[in-house]
Regions:
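N-proximal low-complexity "stem/linker" segments adjacent to membrane-targeting elements
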Residues: 1-23
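Cell-envelope/extracellular polymer assembly enzymes that use nucleotide-activated donors
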Residues: 2-5, 33, 186
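Short, acidic, metal-binding catalytic loop of nucleotide-sugar glycosyltransferases
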Residues: 22-31
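A conserved acidic beta->alpha catalytic loop
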Residues: 30, 38-47, 64, 88
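Glycine-rich, basic loop-to-helix element that forms the pyrophosphate-binding segment
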Residues: 62-79, 92
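Short aromatic/hydrophobic "clamp" motif used to bind/position activated sugar donors
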Residues: 84
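Conserved donor NDP-sugar-binding/catalytic core segment of glycosyltransferases
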Residues: 97-131
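Conserved nucleotide-sugar donor-binding catalytic segment
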Residues: 117, 139-230
Length: 306
């Protein structure tokens, strides 16, 4: 058995897959296999995989398309390693020692099933090429304290980050295929529900490719999908009884201008929704009045306008 299975659920994007595989080949830690499950209809990804000649490669072309989350699970099903290292096809290891650092986190902390790191966010163009703009991000001390004390607070925000920033022990549950947008959050919550111990490094061990063409960008603007997924997770983990989680769900609805009827099936009290909606209207009014005043000042060149 190899130590790590690097699982790459691929769909098209040969540019990204090639960059990822090149970053794998230079890793100082070499006790790994690479599992690529290809959901593409054409042979562009397969060609890149064959050409890369990565040691320990397992390539699987899905006979029937699995979809995004289904393809994640398909990659993990073919893994034989002790540790599972998901790497999405837009992402790559930041430098040659990053895989070693991931392994060290779990090796040095046998009490934990999950480890995660910071990331380098890299802007990509429409075909996956780097555009030059990038920045590092990592969990804050405040958010680290929150999820250390109560893993359910991941419902309030994905403080762990993208799946590529994680490594976990084989035997974890599969990703929930009913979900698309917060599938990673739900997965982390199930892992930590079983074992709340985790390891974190704020180093940007992975680089995350960010572009407007990603699936996450379409999910970001879909109110109906967000209500379904946050409602699903609220029910799964019995979060309704706590106000902070109800308020998170209500704020999601208000963000997408979804009516109370969209929340009612999940047990959200109508008065609580109406109170939050009224507060948001007041805040929006103050904001837009401020915008209008700034525009008037700019138009008339005045230093002060009241």
């Amino acid at each position: 058995m190899v130590k790590v299975s690097i699982c790459v659920p691929a769909y098209k994007n040969p540019v990204g897959v090639e960059r990822l595989l090149e970053s794998v080949k230079v890793q100082s830690f070499t006790d790994y296999e690479v599992v690529v499950t290809d959901d593409s209809q054409d042979g562009s990804v397969e060609e890149v995989v064959r050409r890369a000649e990565v040691p320990g490669m397992v390539y699987v072309r899905n006979a029937v398309r699995k979809g995004a989350t289904g393809n994640w699970n398909e990659a993990v099903r073919h893994a034989s390693g002790e540790y599972i290292k998901i790497m999405h096809h837009d992402d790559w290891f930041t430098d040659r020692d990053c895989l070693a650092r991931f392994v060290e986190m779990l090796e040095e902390h046998p009490e934990a099933d999950l480890a995660f790191c910071g990331s380098r966010q890299v802007m990509l163009d429409g075909v996956g090429n780097r555009m030059g703009e990038e920045f590092d991000r990592a969990i804050s001390d405040e958010h680290l304290k929150m999820i250390s004390e109560d893993w359910r607070d991941l419902y309030i925000g994905d403080y762990i980050g993208a799946p590529s920033a994680t490594i976990y022990r084989k035997g974890a549950p599969e990703y929930e295929e009913k979900l698309t947008w917060i599938v990673d959050v739900e997965f982390y919550m199930r892992l930590l529900q079983k074992n709340p111990r985790f390891v974190v490094s704020k180093e940007p061990l992975v680089s995350i490719g960010v572009s407007e063409n990603q699936l996450t960008e379409s999910c970001r603007t879909d109110g109906t999908l967000n209500i379904f997924e946050y409602g699903f997770v609220m029910q799964e983990f019995s979060l309704l009884s706590e106000e902070k989680y109800r308020q998170k769900f209500i704020q999601i609805a208000l963000k997408y201008k979804m009516p109370f009827a969209s929340l009612a099936p999940y047990g959200i009290p109508k008065k609580e929704y109406e109170k939050a909606a009224a507060k948001k209207r007041r805040e929006d009014f103050v904001f837009y009045v401020g915008v209008a005043k700034r525009k008037v000042r700019e138009a008339f060149g005045k230093k002060r306008f009241t």
